[in-house]
Amino acid sequence: MFGRRSMADPPAPPAIILAGGLAQRMGGGDKALRMVGGRTLLALVIDRLASQCDILALSANGDPARFADYDLPVIADPVDGFRGPLAGVLAGLDWVAEHRPAARWMLSTPADCPFLPRDLVARLHQARIDQQADIAVAASAGRSHPVIALWPVGLRIDLRRALLADDIRKVDRFTARYPRAMAEWPVEPADPFFNANTPQDLAEAEGLAMREPD
């Protein structure tokens, strides 16, 4: 439905980094600004995505000035109420439609995954094509990571309706409506989709960062 068979897609789509979580297990605040290896989680994510994507934007509510050091567009949720990551995805799709009108695809990732694979975009694109899907989702250890995904920009109308009319908030529940591709990554020497949700996770990430070759 969204051109899933096309091989002519641009190799570097826009990306939205989702930083709107409440970080309750870390005591609140901006999880994206927590430090790992002397850098913020957000800086590490940007480093992983910069060479893979045409442009990066940040999905976050509140005062955008707190992210001024990163020189990224900061986009608030386009719907009222805290509706979770799907609202951030919609914010990104709307932003891409306005600022990158030629783009057909958008990558989404959370801001708390500091070791994202450097072939993320390429492998998601290939999985989408090979499996003739509308959406491509990352997976590891037999588990999908729904917010690490490649989305068709044209899906934004359906997504807005799902959020506002159907009150759908779970990413899996929404994407189950469409053909989905899964791209699986190995978890050795470490899971590239490790995410930092707790202070203990941050401590573990410090150790992983010391062993990361790149």
Curated annotation (Swiss-Prot):
One Pfam entry name: NTP_transf_3
Keywords linked to the UniProt accession: Cytoplasm, GTP-binding, Magnesium, Metal-binding, Molybdenum cofactor biosynthesis, Nucleotide-binding, Transferase
Source organism superkingdom: Bacteria
EC number from the UniProt entry: 2.7.7.77
Gene3D superfamilies with a match to the protein in the record: Spore Coat Polysaccharide Biosynthesis Protein SpsA, Chain A (3.90.550.10)
GO biological process, one term: bis(molybdopterin guanine dinucleotide)molybdenum biosynthetic process
Subcellular location: Cytoplasm
Cofactor(s) of this protein: Mg(2+)
Catalytic activity: Mo-molybdopterin + GTP + H(+) = Mo-molybdopterin guanine dinucleotide + diphosphate
Binding site for GTP: L18, A19, G20, K31, D77, D112
Quaternary structure note: Monomer.
Domain remarks: The N-terminal domain determines nucleotide recognition and specific binding, while the C-terminal domain determines the specific binding to the target protein.
Family: Belongs to the MobA family.
Protein name as it appears in the record: Molybdenum cofactor guanylyltransferase
Source species of the chain: Rhodopseudomonas palustris (strain HaA2)
Taxonomic placement: Bacteria, Pseudomonadati, Pseudomonadota, Alphaproteobacteria, Hyphomicrobiales
Gene giving rise to this polypeptide: mobA
